[in-house]
């Protein structure tokens, strides 16, 4: 199956979300792109997260990483982020892409694959 064929199956592309401390955002984003685990990461520098942790309500400024990647690469992406992340239990979740511009979906699949083959 070619990348173009895969682009027609939008489920082959996922968006992953990961929050992190602002000073770590660019490092984590670059890591997953350089490792060929993602085609692109948007860094939203400041989001407010309100959550319960160890019985207490926390209110923190974080950065949000919006990661475009192949669905197949998500397990490795998740594990890489978990290992490199400063939090004990980082948010790393995957959302399936239901639809998108076919040329963009094809690019996501190709760019991530290109990154992995360049490192080989």
Task: Place the predicted regions along the sequence by residue.
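Positively charged, small/polar-rich N-terminal and surface patches that mediate targeting and assembly
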Residues: 1-120
């Amino acid at each position: 199956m070619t990348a173009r064929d895969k682009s027609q199956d939008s489920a082959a592309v996922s968006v992953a979300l990961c929050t992190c401390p602002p000073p770590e955002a660019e490092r984590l984003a670059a890591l997953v792109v350089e490792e060929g685990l993602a085609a692109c990461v948007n860094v939203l520098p400041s989001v407010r997260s309100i959550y319960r942790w160890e019985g207490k309500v926390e209110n923190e400024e974080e950065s949000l990483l919006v990661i475009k990647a192949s669905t197949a690469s998500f397990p490795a992406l998740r594990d890489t982020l978990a290992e490199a992340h400063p939090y004990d239990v980082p948010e790393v979740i995957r959302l399936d892409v239901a639809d998108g511009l076919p040329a963009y979906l094809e690019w996501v699949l190709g760019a991530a694959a290109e990154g992995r083959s360049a490192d080989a």
